[in-house]
Amino acid sequence: MSTQQVPPVTAIGTPRITAGYDEYGRLDLQAHQEVHGGFAALSSGELIGLADRIELRGRGGAGFPFARKVRAVIDSCKRQDLPPIIVVNGTEGEPPSWKDKAVLTRGPHLILDGAALAAAALDAEEIVIGVADDGVGQNSLMAALAERKMPCPTRIVTVPHRFISGEGGALVRGINGEAHIPPGRKVRSSDNGVMGLPTLLSNAETYSQLAIAARLGPWEYNSVGLPEEPGTVMLTVGGASSSPAVVEAPSGTPLMDVLNMCGADIGPGLLVGGYHGKWITAKQAETVMISRKGFAKVGGTLGAGMLIPIGSKTCPIGEAAQVVQYLAGESAGQCGPCRLGLPDLARAVTLVSLGGNALENVRQAAGLVKGRGACSHPDGTSRFALSALEVFAKDVEAHANGEGCGKSVKGILPLPYTAETGARKLALDWSRCDGHGLCSAVAPEIIRLDHNGFPAFPQTPLPPWLEDGARKAVNVCPALALRLIDPAAGGH
């Protein structure tokens, strides 16, 4: 993955965060100042007041009020007599999402402005910016830091490009030199974050919005968008779109305006909010205005702003099955519902895609993981799977009847680990397998035994961190029936 793969950026109405992109491509410090101008420093009270008046919420998915985060950090600093840390979450671990990478790559100074505002207002010890190790945006950010002076020491930390690496607790752990996975228990970063200090952690777009608001002031900022959710929203439109793009649009913009701009073929459904989001129908999409409340009215979620039309020419159940398999492989492996429950869910959804009558198995597997994980990963994965079966009920029925939907899986829902990226997958020689079951004992997060006692596992490429377990399973097979193959090399 390289910076050249960042999709085009466009806007509906007057751009704010993306202003100057068309003229300059990437905004260095001089271009940034020409486009956006300067801003005045804020006190902690002014920072909270500004965030409150513009109803600023986190743009990483959860939508938590930014002012409440700031208050919590200030209270914790006073209580513990410690300085705070400012953390910018620019990891963007979801494969379909590009909005933060687009800003990191083309407008990094706006992110740094927002972080600098918060750091100066709170008299922070340090600013830490977390980015994925895929290389997208990191060089641009480093160049931007070299051009300017920050109010306190500022460093960039890279984390593995995994789905769960961007979870707040996982990012804090990674910065602290621990495993880049969510903590097994609830920990408030505002109390105990980076280096044990109170930590203000928010998403890259959130800090960019803060920088825009500091320049415009609350009245002008609120002049665009909905009264209850003012300002613009950064969206990623991908999937079955002829012109996929990162789009900046005012809240309240009709969803169809955004989709039509990108040439979207919705087909039977649209995924909103990413791989922990939900599917909505094409008819529902016609009624939605871009906002958290707008998506909630049709049972969806804005999340981190991902809009993925499935299209009319791909198999939605097969696409969904691949994503659930991927999400199962992204487990941190630290709780049973995630480590064992998600592979069960993935197998059940895969069986549905292959024509098996496994709907009840999907519901049962989803029910067993819901609300029981150490983080939100099991809940989000089960929500994605169940909504797919609901929205694509006609396709599910066609598969169950043995006829199939007549459409192929085309990779409309992107995955980071494919044959093209060098990922390997397991293969079974059925002529050799005697059903000993040893493989499932050493790698239960990958392999389970079917009702006949034979190994069953996803047919998608394995993420690198599961290869070791797969290799152990291969080595213990007494019949030499199990192999790790490279699909790109013709299965060798």
Residue ranges and their predicted role:
Residues 230-239, 249, 414-452, 460, ...:
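C-terminal accessory/binding modules appended to enzymatic or scaffolding proteins
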Residues 2-48:
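Cofactor-/ligand-binding subdomain signature composed of acidic, glycine-rich
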Residues 107-121:
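Histidine-anchored nucleotide/phosphate-binding helix
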Residues 28-33, 88-100, 191-192, 236-241:
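Gly-rich Lys/Arg/Thr-decorated short loops/hinges at beta-loop-alpha junctions or inter-strand turns
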Residues 82, 133-251, 262-264:
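Hydrophobic alpha-helical positions that pack around
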Residues 35-46, 50, 82-84, 101-104, ...:
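Ferredoxin-type iron-sulfur electron-transfer modules in oxidoreductases and energy-metabolism complexes
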Residues 52-73, 162-173, 328-338, 373-385:
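Conserved phosphate/anionic-ligand binding catalytic regions in large, soluble enzymes, centered on
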